[in-house]
Amino acid sequence: MIPTPVIVTFANQKGGVGKTTLCVTFANYLVTKGVRVVVIDCDFQHSIMKCRKADIRKYGEQDMPYEVWAYEANDKAMITSLMEKLHNDPEIDVVLMDSPGSLKTEGLIPLFVNSDIIIVPFHYDLVTVPSTASFLMFVDRLKKAVGERMKARLFIIPNLNDGRIGKRSELVIWDNARDTFSNYGYVTAKIPKRADMERFSTMAALDMQATIVTPVFDKVYQSIFDTLQPIREKELKGIQLTENLNPKPKKKKKYDPNIVRTKSASLMRNI
């Protein structure tokens, strides 16, 4: 258990890189580890929420392994408030955010600033590589602009990789891209292009998904529980010590997750 939730955001401005599928498969992976997960669908298509509704019709709501909430990322104030409240929810270990692709989305800045980990999937092709490079530079500029408030670690995942594609000259470009991307974050092993990775379920991993993604997800899991968890525990002890030395006359109002679930349920009915 982690004292305060770790927020993991899946993001890239380039569509079609498997961002949403990886978000759900990572949720399914974490559940098998006994991690308390919440998935928040902020993508404009709300594909995860639509899948969850289909899974509920098929399996029943009581059997769902984790909650899925839907939010509109265009509402900057709502996203800012949500992120602040999530950091103080003791009932959650990891929050997975599926972010929208457009960098013009109002709520994207507070979402990134408050994330502990940002996972950036991409493909090795002549369109996705430069688009991903542009996105990584955007995140880097944001980190420099906000300073210590943004501590997100980046995991950059070569996703749906097809080793049969690419001329010799293009393979050189891919190698150079990997070297460049490593300046912004940790570039993981490749996830191969398989039919199993072209669909997903919010109930459990499908077919061979777990086998395909586990080597990559293990790295992210280790970052959360071998590195971030001890840091969070120290931070919590420091906060508790400060509160004991300087008791406040009034307690801060406790976050009620039911409020969030009510808003999410309202949005879910409209999808």
Regions from the PLM with identified roles:
Residues 2-4, 11-13, 17, 28-105, ...:
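P-loop/Walker-type NTP enzyme "switch/lid" segment
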Residues 252-271:
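Long, low-complexity, intrinsically disordered segments
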